[in-house]
């Protein structure tokens, strides 16, 4: 699963998921899956969506993952009293804002791309829309 090889600090503040999204256009492929809401996307969810898309297109096209989980989420063990420091890192997430392109696909027909993105969207905790590359 995706996670950084090295970070400056092991743990991070909780923070808030506000602001506008970067990466709102399809750049690498011809089709994209765009988020229509805010969420925390975990490494497991990204991997699950990637596998669903790969199986659907039968490894004939190319998939680009435009998100990377670089924020550590900590958790204390069950039935542990408050205090005694911050918990251990349990999983990694990426904060998603509306309009962010999550995945891109190329070298496949539009019907196959739509079907693959539909399967991937079922694995994600946020509403998504299908977008195509606009040529200027």
UniProtKB/Swiss-Prot annotation:
Annotated GO MF terms: rRNA binding; structural constituent of ribosome; tRNA binding
Coiled-coil positions: none
A Gene Ontology term for the protein's cellular component: cytosolic large ribosomal subunit
UniProt key word rRNA-binding: yes
Record keywords: Ribonucleoprotein, Ribosomal protein, RNA-binding, rRNA-binding, tRNA-binding
CDD domains: Ribosomal_L16_L10e
Domain of life per record: Bacteria
Pfam families documented for this protein: Ribosomal_L16
Gene3D superfamilies: Ribosomal protein L10e/L16
Keyword Ribonucleoprotein: yes
PROSITE patterns: RIBOSOMAL_L16_1, RIBOSOMAL_L16_2
GO terms classed as biological process: translation
Function: Binds 23S rRNA and is also seen to make contacts with the A and possibly P site tRNAs.
NCBIfam families associated with the record: rplP_bact
Subunit structure: Part of the 50S ribosomal subunit.
Protein family membership: Belongs to the universal ribosomal protein uL16 family.
Official protein name in the record: Large ribosomal subunit protein uL16
Species: Hamiltonella defensa subsp. Acyrthosiphon pisum (strain 5AT)
């Amino acid at each position: 699963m995706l996670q950084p090889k090295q970070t400056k600090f092991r743990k991070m503040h909780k923070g808030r998921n506000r602001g506008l999204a970067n990466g709102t256009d399809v750049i690498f492929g011809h089709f994209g899956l765009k988020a229509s809401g805010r969420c925390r996307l975990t490494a497991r969810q990204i991997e699950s969506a990637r596998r669903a898309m790969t199986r659907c297109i039968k490894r004939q096209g190319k998939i680009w993952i435009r998100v990377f989980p670089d924020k550590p989420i900590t958790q204390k063990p069950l039935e542990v009293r408050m205090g005694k420091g911050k918990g251990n890192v349990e999983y990694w997430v990426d904060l998603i804002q509306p309009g962010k392109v999550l995945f891109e696909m190329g070298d496949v027909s539009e019907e196959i791309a739509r079907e693959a993105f539909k399967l991937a969207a079922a694995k994600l905790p946020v509403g998504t829309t299908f977008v195509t590359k606009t040529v200027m």
